[in-house]
Amino acid sequence: MFVFLVLLPLVSSQCVNLTTRTQLPPAYTNSFTRGVYYPDKVFRSSVLHSTQDLFLPFFSNVTWFHAIHVSGTNGTKRFDNPVLPFNDGVYFASTEKSNIIRGWIFGTTLDSKTQSLLIVNNATNVVIKVCEFQFCNDPFLGVYYHKNNKSWMESEFRVYSSANNCTFEYVSQPFLMDLEGKQGNFKNLREFVFKNIDGYFKIYSKHTPINLVRDLPQGFSALEPLVDLPIGINITRFQTLLALHRSYLTPGDSSSGWTAGAAAYYVGYLQPRTFLLKYNENGTITDAVDCALDPLSETKCTLKSFTVEKGIYQTSNFRVQPTESIVRFPNITNLCPFGEVFNATRFASVYAWNRKRISNCVADYSVLYNSASFSTFKCYGVSPTKLNDLCFTNVYADSFVIRGDEVRQIAPGQTGKIADYNYKLPDDFTGCVIAWNSNNLDSKVGGNYNYLYRLFRKSNLKPFERDISTEIYQAGSTPCNGVEGFNCYFPLQSYGFQPTNGVGYQPYRVVVLSFELLHAPATVCGPKKSTNLVKNKCVNFNFNGLTGTGVLTESNKKFLPFQQFGRDIADTTDAVRDPQTLEILDITPCSFGGVSVITPGTNTSNQVAVLYQDVNCTEVPVAIHADQLTPTWRVYSTGSNVFQTRAGCLIGAEHVNNSYECDIPIGAGICASYQTQTNSPRRARSVASQSIIAYTMSLGAENSVAYSNNSIAIPTNFTISVTTEILPVSMTKTSVDCTMYICGDSTECSNLLLQYGSFCTQLNRALTGIAVEQDKNTQEVFAQVKQIYKTPPIKDFGGFNFSQILPDPSKPSKRSFIEDLLFNKVTLADAGFIKQYGDCLGDIAARDLICAQKFNGLTVLPPLLTDEMIAQYTSALLAGTITSGWTFGAGAALQIPFAMQMAYRFNGIGVTQNVLYENQKLIANQFNSAIGKIQDSLSSTASALGKLQDVVNQNAQALNTLVKQLSSNFGAISSVLNDILSRLDKVEAEVQIDRLITGRLQSLQTYVTQQLIRAAEIRASANLAATKMSECVLGQSKRVDFCGKGYHLMSFPQSAPHGVVFLHVTYVPAQEKNFTTAPAICHDGKAHFPREGVFVSNGTHWFVTQRNFYEPQIITTDNTFVSGNCDVVIGIVNNTVYDPLQPELDSFKEELDKYFKNHTSPDVDLGDISGINASVVNIQKEIDRLNEVAKNLNESLIDLQELGKYEQYIKWPWYIWLGFIAGLIAIVMVTIMLCCMTSCCSCLKGCCSCGSCCKFDEDDSEPVLKGVKLHYT
C-alpha cells in the first residue's frame, strides 16, 4: 500500500557498517543485443545510419550482482554494492520488483578530497548533487515495515556523512513510490547508459516490463536520452545504492536485523564501436548491427545493408579497436622557468628584443592560457588548448615592449614599422603571442623615454633578425658622415609612455613563444604522466605529442641520433623512438585488410566462411590480432575447417574432394557453395546437414584424350600443332575499406567522413558490381562445358613434332582479263614521291617495282594497287606458294616481288604518316608557343595589378602566405590525422581533415573508374572465351586461325587464375601438291559450285577435294550444285587517304577577357588614413611587355609542310567498256539503215548500190561448238 511521506532531507547521517552478509564472487551473464541507445538528437526516418561511439558490445559478458535473502539458519544474505571502475562508460541494467535499486555514486576518490556526483531516489524525490562528499563505507537506504498498520516507509538514509563545496544540485518534483517488498518473478527491467564526455554526464534510459526469474531478457530496445548534466568532474569509479528492509527500529542495533529484497543488477562497459542502426519511418531504432561482432556483421556494415546476397565480399576493419591508451614523454621533472620571462622587472626595447631558450623542463601552458591578466593570447600552427599534450625540441621566449596599437603587427605576414624594422615573425610561424597592458609598470609622469623602437632602416628585417645598430640613416643622396641633419636621421625613436595616454599609446609587454618542432629529441613537454609501454596490441599512443592508433612492435630500423620519427615512401609515420627507453618501434595498423567473407546469403543462412588473402593459415591469428577479437570472430582464426589455398587461408568452409559446378568463385580455382553434405571426408555424419563447402573448380566428368594414344588418323602430309591461348575472364575482386583508406584509425576523421553521405557506399557498390560481373563471366564461360579434358605435357611423341607451327596456306586469287580497259580516278595525299612514281609508271603496270622511288633514304611505293597489279602479284604469290614444297627454293623466289612491293608500300604509308606527324608537331609547338605568350601576358598583368595592390593595401603579404598554405597538396601534411587534431582546434582541424578527405576521395574515384574500364575489357575477353568454349571445345571450328593456328581439330580448356587456358590442337600442311583451282565450272551457261571444298585439276581431269587436305573425288551431282550464271561482277573500292584535320586557332580575346574584364580591387579600410602608401604607380614596363606579347601572338603562324595531291587513273571494268562498244555499234547500224531507206548510194555516182547496201543475207556463220569451258576469277 502507498503512504504519503514528507521529503526526507539529504543531510549528513551516521554511517553504519553492515554485517552478517555473504560475500560471493560476482557471476556473469550474456548481454545479447541490449544496450543500444540513440547516439544523437537528430531525427532520422527510414534510413540506415552508421555511427562510431561508445557502445556495449553485443553478446558480451556483463557482471551480475544481487540483493537477496534466502531464509533459513544458514541462509544467504547478499547485498552487493562494490565500488566498480567507470572506464569509458557504463551500461547498467536492473531487474527488480520492490524498488531496491535507488541510485549511484560517481567520482574518483569518493571522499571529501574530490567532488563526486550523487544520483539518488529517496522514495519521494530524485536528487542530483555534485559536492565533496564523505561517503559511507556501506552506503544504503533503509525501508521500515510497520507491522501494526501494515505499511512501508522510508526510514534511513545512510549514504554520506558530510557534503561540502556543492557546485550542482537538482531536486525533482515530489512523487510516491511503492516500497512494498513483493514476491514472485522480476517485473521491471530498467536500463541505463552513463557517459562522461567533455564535462557533460550523459544518461540514457529505458523501462521495459518483464516476467523473469533471472538473467537479462533477449530482444532489442533502444535507450533514449534522459539528461545531460554539466558537472565538469572527472569520473573513474562508481557505486550502486541499494535499499534494505527492516521489520523493526532499534537505534542501538542498526547494523543487523535487516533483510534484502530480491533484486539484481548487471554492469557492462562501453567500448569504442561502430554500429549500424536501422530507423523506421517514425524515427525509432528498430534494429542494430555490432560491426565488430562477427564476419557477417562486419560484412553488413561494409555493405551498409541488413541483408547480404550470396557471394564473397571484402570487409572493412571494424573488428579490432584500441584496448588502452599509452603516453610516453621523456623523464623530465624540472618545471620550465616561464616566471623568469613573464615576471621580469624590466623588458627590453623592441628593436633590441630579448630571447631566452627554454629546454629540459616540463611546461604547464594551462597556467598561461587560463590567466585573466593577458589581453592577447594567440597561437599560430597550434591550438593553445592542445599545448599540454605536445613536446618540442626547444621553446624560445622573446620579450619586449611596444605600443598597444602595435600588438597586431606581432603576427605572421604583417607589415608596419614594428614588423618591418624591429621584430619580424616568419610566415610559417609555429608558436604563441602573449601580450598584456603594463601601463602601471612602464609609464611615468612626464614620459618614460627608455623604451625605443627603430623608425628608419634601409631594408626590411628578415624573420627573427635583430638589428641593434645606431648608425645615422641617410634619406637623401648626400652622405651623412655620422652626423644628424637634413635627410640624416637618428634611426631610433623613443615611445615616451605616460600614464594618461590612451590605451592604444600605452605600453604593452609582449612575450612570443616559438616552438621548435621535433627535429631532435624532445626536451620540453607538457605535464602529462607517462604510462607503461604496451607492445603487440592495438592502442592509442602519444609519443612526444605524436598521437595516433596502431600496434607497436620491435623494429630493426636504424635512426640517426636526432631522429624521432620514421616515415615510409607514402610520407606515413611508420616508426617512432620511445623517448624513455630510446627503443625504436614500428607502427602498424590495427587492421588486417585482406579479409573476405563468403556467405550463401542472409536469406539462406547466417553461416559464413572467411578468406584471409595471401596469408598462411599458421599466421592468421597473429595477422588479425586474434587475441583482441570477439569470441565469435576468434573462431574464424583457427579451427578444424582450415584450408590453405593459393588465394590464402580459408576458414569456416569444409573442404571436399568432390567437384561441383562453381557457385561462389573464390579465386585460384577454388569455389564454395552452401549445400547438404553427407559424406564429409573430415568427419562422419549420421544426419545430413547444410554447410558451406569448398572445392576445386570443375568443368564436368572426366574422360581421356584420344589423340594422346594415336587413335586419330592423321594425313602423312600434315603435322600436328598445339597452340596455347590464355584468355582472362575475371580479375581480382577488390573492395576499398573507404574509411580506413581515407582516415586510417582517426575517429574524428571517420565521423567527418559520414557527412559525405553515401560516397563510400556507392564506391563499394560499384566495385561489388564489378565483382558480381566477374562471377557472371566465369559462370558463363564454363557453364557450356560438359566434359573435362586432361591434356598430357606437350612433347614429341608418336613420331609427331608438336613444337613447330608452319606458315598458313595462302588463298589464290585472280582477276578477269576483260577488266583491263578504261580508267577511274582516285586521289591520294602525296608526301613528295607519288607524282614521280606516276611519271615513271606510265600505263604499264608491270613497271611497278621498277618505278619505286627514294624518299629520305627509303624505297617507297604508293599505298594503292590497281586490279592489274593485284592480279600480277597474286599470280606470282600463288605460283610461289604452290611450288614451295617441290622446287626447293624456286617457289620462294617467286614470292619475293610480292614481299618487296608490300614492304615498299608500307614504307610509303610510313613516310606519309611521318609528314603528317611533323605537321601535327608544328601545330602543337606553335600552339604551345601561343599559350606561353598568353601566360607571359597574364604574368605581366598580374605584376601590374600586384603593384596597384601593394599601393592600396599593405597586407598583401598575408594573402600571399594564405595562397602558399592552400597550394600545398594533401600529402604534405602529416599523414597521421591525429597529429592535426593534437595541434589544432576542432574547427581548424576539421577544415584540414576535410581537405585530406576530398583529395583521397578523388583518388578513390579515379581508381574505381580504372576498375570499371578494366572490367569492360575483361567482359569483352570473357565473351570471346565463351564463344571459343562453344565453337572450339564443343565443336570443330571451320574458321582458320580462330581456334589456334591452322585447321582446327579439337580444343581442351583448363582453368587458370582469373581466366581459362585453351590448348588448341590444329594441323598445318607440311607439304603441298601443285594443282590448279577454280571457284566454279561453267557448263551450258550455268555455274557449277562445289558443295564443300574446291575444284582442282591434276592436269588432265577436274576433281573436288576438301580445302584442308587433299582427297580428290570425281565431280558428281552429289558434291556440286548449280546456281546462277557465269557472269562475274567486279566491285571497285575507292581508297581515299584523308588529310589531317587542322582546326582553326580560336581567338584568344575571350580568354583574355576573363582576366581583364570586371577586375575589382579589394575593399580598403581607411580607418587609419596615415597608413596608406601614396607612392606613384609606374606600370609602363608592364604595358610595354603586354604590347610585345600581343605582337608575338600575331606572329604565332603555323607553316605546315604542304602535302601534295596526286591523281592516279584506274582502269574501268570490262562491262563498262562492253556497254560503250555496244552503243557505238548501235549508232553505226542506225546510220546504215537510214542510208538504205533514203537511196543513199545514188549520191555516190554508182560507186555502190542500194541493193547491196540494204540487202539482208542469211547468216552463214558456223555454229558454236557445244562443250565445256572454264571460267576463272
Curated annotation (Swiss-Prot):
Practical applications according to UniProt: Main component of the anti-COVID19 vaccines BNT162b2/Pfizer-Biontech and mRNA-1273/Moderna; in which the mutations of Lys-986 (K986P) and Val-987 (V987P) have been added to stabilize the protein in the prefusion state.
Impact reported for residue 52 to H: In strain: Omicron/EG.5.1
Reported impact of residue 152 to R: In strain: Omicron/BA.2.75
Effect ascribed to mutating residue 496 to S: In strain: Omicron/BA.1
Consequence of substituting residue 371 to F: In strain: Omicron/BA.2, Omicron/BA.2.12.1, Omicron/BA.2.75, Omicron/BA.4, Omicron/BA.5, Omicron/BQ.1.1, Omicron/XBB.1.5, Omicron/EG.5.1
Impact after mutating residue 375 to F: In strain: Omicron/BA.1, Omicron/BA.2, Omicron/BA.2.12.1, Omicron/BA.2.75, Omicron/BA.4, Omicron/BA.5, Omicron/BQ.1.1, Omicron/XBB.1.5, Omicron/EG.5.1
Outcome, altering residue 452 to Q: In strain: Omicron/BA.2.12.1
Phenotype for residue 486 to P: In strain: Omicron/XBB.1.5, Omicron/EG.5.1
GO cellular component, one term: host extracellular space
Stated consequence of mutating residue 371 to L: In strain: Omicron/BA.1
Recorded coiled-coil stretches: 949-993, 1176-1203
Span list, region Disordered: 1-26, 67-80, 142-164, 173-185, 246-262, 319-335, 455-490, 519-541, 621-640, 673-687, 828-853
Effect of residue 490 to S: In strain: Lambda/C.37, Omicron/BQ.1.1, Omicron/XBB.1.5, Omicron/EG.5.1
Disulphide bridges, residue numbers: 15-136, 131-166, 291-301, 336-361, 379-432, 391-525, 480-488, 538-590, 617-649, 662-671, 738-760, 743-749, 840-851, 1032-1043, 1082-1126
Result of changing residue 452 to R: Increased resistance to neutralizing antibodies. Decreases HLA binding to NF9 epitope. Increased binding affinity to human ACE2
Phenotype for residue 677 to H: In strain: Eta/B.1.525
Anything else known: Variant D614G has become the most prevalent circulating sequence in the global pandemic since April 2020. The mutation is associated with higher viral loads produced in cell culture and animal models. It would not change pathogenicity nor neutralization properties vs vaccination. May be prevalent because the mutation increases virus transmission in human population.
Protein name as catalogued: Spike glycoprotein
Organism per entry: Severe acute respiratory syndrome coronavirus 2
